UniProtKB/Swiss-Prot annotation:
This is Cytoplasmic dynein 1 intermediate chain 2. The keyword Acetylation applies. The lineage of its organism: Eukaryota, Metazoa, Chordata, Craniata, Vertebrata. One of its GO terms (cellular component) is cytoplasm. Residues 82-91 have a biased composition (Low complexity). Residues 1-13, 20-43, 164-188 have a biased composition (Basic and acidic residues).
Length: 612
């Protein structure tokens, strides 16, 4: 209770102080106004008026006379403090009432005496209230008490006019002062700094994406714009041009040697190129990363090295790394996090590694256990750790029956297998091999082609039936052949091409679909469930350049081809071809049975003709 009473008394004192300040302000304002009016009156008619002191004396005498006191009475109550004014007793109130009632009547002098004042404080009833506030952008007006408290605080001395002038002059001089002109040396230092190069590389890539983005504002969702294409839709809209990638400096007059799609970022495509004979001062080897997501015409990343890049792949499980196999035999590793376009790692040119061109690089394994596998044309296969390319983890010579080494030109691993693989060779033979075990090395030889093997690929579509034993090959003998690891003779030979067939690849989603490209600039899609004599869909690239590489996207809805002039073309594959139906695996099984039966009949006929 004592704390509350002290707090209440303190609040009362503050209120009284504020009231005194207000009264003082009002009194000063009234005096100022009165002085102004008096000056005006004196200007019109100067009249000698009584002074303020005389007027106040007369008012005091009139007030004393109204209360029954004479001017000579020495009894004058002392001035009361603000605190005593706020607390009044019943006796004082009664005396005031009696005094008021006697106004106008003449009475004798009143005897004044001393009275004991008893002060009683009654604490106010505590009222608990709850308030809910809502934030708004409008600034609330300050309370009167806060304004008065601010008035009580002594204000800071204002800045002298001279100081203000000097400050303004300084500001004007700063604004008018020209910026510091950088010297050529300082400019070059900034341009070659690590921070500027990183910022410029990142910013230009974003600006290019924004400038190249094109949106069809005339697209009609009602479908009326599809009426003209109804015939194509009925025909399946088999192949349609999507994008073309070409760079005047980095890909002109260069041959596309390899293509690979990123598994982490499906829109990214890496392409490797060999040397440009027309530009001897440019790097011999180039690897460009193209972006399908944005309509920009420049590569996302540019990498190069001093030897022609014969093979390239994204390092699986390492989205920032790109691996390249070079003509000199070196394996190079680029990192897109680095501002350098040159390799961040490379293998040594020594007998422990490759000394011949590396046409095959592949990352196999799982997230926690994976290796980089490389094969060169001297038949040497090496296994590497991506963390250390100074020395291979293990190496092996691919030799068939203690004869000369196999000159490998292409390689493929079956789905989910990291030990067994198939390779194609320069002499036209196909070999199965394994990396580990008692029979490490070449296992079997498959003969059937009459020219060097240019491409090989194992069946990759996963479904109800396992077809991982199948693989296809392409060759200089103008044919594509279908094989199974269970038989060393080809199951079927596709002979619809009239030039070298440079590459072949199974669809990653459709069990009976594969693609091949030839030297006439033609891309063929074969759906073996529909026909085995002619391709289901074909298209020729404008200008008919030789197509060196073909690569499906992971979704199987787009396909990329690279030609001998450095251009990459992306085609959209029609839904009726690319998307398999539920019965495609069963149908493909029946197709294989028919192919095997026809091959057996042909072998029997050939056997009967030989004795005759």
């Amino acid at each position: 209770m004592s704390d509350k009473s002290e707090l209440k008394a303190e609040l009362e004192r503050k209120k009284q102080r504020l009231a005194q300040i207000r009264e003082g302000k009002k009194r000063k304002e009234e005096e100022r106004k009165k002085k102004e009016t008096d000056q005006k009156k004196e200007a019109v008619a100067p009249v000698q008026e009584e002074s303020d002191l005389e007027k106040k004396r007369r008012e005091a005498e009139a007030l004393l006379q109204s209360m029954g006191l004479t001017a000579e009475s020495p009894i004058v109550p002392p001035p009361m403090s603000p605190s005593s004014k706020s607390v009044s007793t019943p006796s004082e109130a009664g005396s005031q009432d009696s005094g008021d009632g006697a106004v106008g009547s003449r009475r004798g002098p009143i005897k004044l005496g001393m009275a004991k004042i008893t002060q009683v404080d009654f604490p106010p009833r505590e009222i608990v209230t709850y308030t809910k506030e809502t934030q708004t952008p409008v600034m609330a007006q300050p309370k009167e008490d806060e304004e008065e408290e601010d008035d009580v605080v002594t204000p800071k001395p204002p800045i002298e006019p001279e100081e203000e002038k000097t400050l303004k002059k300084d500001e004007e001089s700063d604004s008018k002062a020209p910026p510091h002109e950088l010297t050529e040396e300082e400019k070059q230092q900034i341009l070659h700094s690590e921070e500027f190069l990183s910022f410029f590389d990142h910013s230009t890539r974003i600006v290019e994406r924004a400038l190249s983005e094109q949106i069809n504002i005339f697209f009609d969702y009602s479908g009326r714009d599809l009426e003209d294409k109804e015939g194509e839709i009925q025909a399946g809209a088999k192949l349609s041009l999507n994008r073309q990638f070409f760079d005047e400096r980095w890909s002109k007059h260069r041959v596309v040697s390899c293509l690979d799609w990123s598994s982490q970022y499906p829109e990214l495509l890496v392409a490797s190129y060999n040397n440009n004979e027309d530009a001897p001062h440019e790097p011999d080897g180039v690897a460009l990363v193209w972006n399908m997501k944005y309509k920009k015409t420049t590569p996302e990343y540019v990498f190069h090295c001093q030897s022609a890049v014969m093979s390239a792949t994204f390092a699986k499980f390492h989205p920032n790394l790109v691996v390249g196999g070079t003509y000199s035999g070196q394996i190079v590793l680029w990192d897109n996090r680095s501002n350098k376009r040159t390799p961040v790692q490379r293998t040594p040119l020594s007998a422990a590694a490759h000394t011949h061109p590396v046409y095959c690089v592949n990352v196999v394994g799982t997230q926690n256990a994976h290796n980089l596998i490389s094969i060169s044309t001297d038949g040497k296969i090496c296994s590497w750790s991506l963390d250390m390319l100074s020395h291979p983890q293990d190496s092996m010579e691919l030799v068939h029956k203690q004869s000369k080494a196999v000159a490998v030109t292409s390689m493929s691993f079956p789905v989910g297998d990291v030990n067994n693989f198939v390779v194609g060779s320069e002499e036209g033979s196909v070999y199965t091999a394994c990396r580990h075990g008692s029979k490490a090395g070449i296992s079997e030889m498959f003969e059937g082609h009459q020219g060097p093997i240019t491409g090989i690929h194992c069946h990759s579509a996963v479904g109800a039936v396992d077809f991982s034993h199948l693989f296809v090959t392409s060759s200089f003998d103008w044919t594509v052949k279908l094989w199974t690891t269970k038989n060393n003779k080809p199951l079927y030979s596709f002979e619809d091409n009239s030039d070298y067939v440079y590459d072949v690849m199974w669809s990653p989603t459709h069990p009976a679909l594969f693609a091949c490209v030839d030297g006439m600039g033609r891309l063929d899609l074969w759906n073996l469930n529909n026909d085995t004599e002619v391709p289901t869909a074909s298209i020729s690239v404008e200008g008919n350049p030789a197509l060196n590489r073909v690569r499906w996207t992971h979704s199987g809805r787009e396909i990329a081809v690279g030609d001998s002039e450095g251009q990459i073309v992306i085609y959209d594959v029609g839904e009726q071809i690319a998307v398999p139906r539920n019965d495609e695996w069963a149908r493909f099984g029946r197709t294989l049975a028919e192919i095997n039966a026809n091959r057996a009949d042909a072998e029997e006929e050939a056997a009967t003709r030989i004795p005759a």
